[in-house]
Amino acid sequence: MAKTVAYFYDPDVGNFHYGAGHPMKPHRLALTHSLVLHYGLYKKMIVFKPYQASQHDMCRFHSEDYIDFLQRVSPNNMQGFTKSLNAFNVGDDCPVFPGLFEFCSRYTGASLQGATQLNNKICDIAINWAGGLHHAKKFEASGFCYVNDIVIGILELLKYHPRVLYIDIDIHHGDGVQEAFYLTDRVMTVSFHKYGNYFFPGTGDMYEVGAESGRYYALNVPLRDGIDDQSYKHLFQPVINQVVDYYQPTCIVLQCGADSLGRDRLGCFNLSIRGHGECVEYVKSFNIPLLVLGGGGYTVRNVARCWTYETSLLVDEAISEELPYSEYFEYFAPDFTLHPDVSTRIENQNSRQYLDQIRQTIFENLKMLNHAPSVQIHDVPSDLLSYDRTDEPDPEERGSEENYSRPEAANEFYDGDHDNDKESDVEI
């Protein structure tokens, strides 16, 4: 039976700019959306211009002082916020840039609306590639993330769902989400990530398992450099299969950070786009309501390829290896294909013995769980969102390609030999 897929895209979200030289480039979202349009994948989905989250929405997880600061600070007045900038960890990795709060509002609102639509059974799968900012903490920004849209979306899902499973395939540990739900059995967090050698954020070893009611409901899969498709699959599928069997989630949130691909500007894994997509396809195969989010990914042309390919998997539509012509076509030179070779010469340091040891430890921890913990569900409060449905595009107009204004900042999108941001400084 075909799944109903809701797709959330704000035409302005790709216009925000963290600053010259910063590896996080929201413009990758415009590039992804362009491919989704030109491949015709929008025809297989319900396309929404998303709700914009309010301060109240963000304060469901974050502190009021922190969100008030994000709303007030700007490049023009930040000199008056020196104490707050330090207190809230806003500065180098998480800079103040024009429209910062608006950017947070747009990506968070889309995740929130996706959760609400899943709750109301409007869709089976909700996609927000702008979301997935998993490092943000209750009181501070972290790792290019300001507002944790994932936590806020999960809190919305918990109104209707007794158990939510969170899966994270970003190369970085999903520390902000784990921390938020560390003491509860209502959410199980599973993160596959690079661990060791002071790799950011430095958390996520196998022995972080949760505490109090949440003991054994945080599951970490610490990986070493150079993991390839075969090794990743050897762990991912059996672990997720066992987790779903033991935990019996009624909804899944999947963070699809694309920095786990080979040749990522900040990564050190060796996954292909197909290998990354295989994880998405496997999670989809459980036929459990699914919220799909973006995350990291810093070689932008490959991020767009990856998330477009994964959109095609989610709507069960085979798409051509040759990329369709679009306004961004030249960014995919020289091959102009969906699945270029992204492998590197980084050695796979994940031996079969090491992977089997991780798997064994995880399976032993899973045996400590109560099968499918039961929770008392109280009266469901009204939906967080009361967005105006007139904002939804007319289905008859979804096929038209809007002429969005897409200003590009200098150095925003170079991705090759002349990249002033040194985007290609990856060992090949």
Swiss-Prot record:
Stretches the record annotates as Histone deacetylase: 3-316
Protein name: Histone deacetylase 3
Ranges annotated as biased composition (Basic and acidic residues): 386-405, 415-428
Subcellular location(s) per record: Nucleus; Chromosome; Cytoplasm, Cytosol
Classification via InterPro entries: HDAC_PDAC (IPR050284), His_deacetylse (IPR000286), His_deacetylse_1 (IPR003084), His_deacetylse_dom (IPR023801), His_deacetylse_dom_sf (IPR037138), Ureohydrolase_dom_sf (IPR023696)
Enzyme class: hydrolase
Gene Ontology molecular functions: chromatin binding; DNA-binding transcription factor binding; histone deacetylase activity; histone deacetylase activity, hydrolytic mechanism; histone decrotonylase activity; metal ion binding; protein de-2-hydroxyisobutyrylase activity; protein decrotonylase activity
Ligand binding (Zn(2+)): D170, H172, D259
Binding site for 1D-myo-inositol 1,4,5,6-tetrakisphosphate: H17, G21, K25, R265
EC number: 3.5.1.98, 3.5.1.-
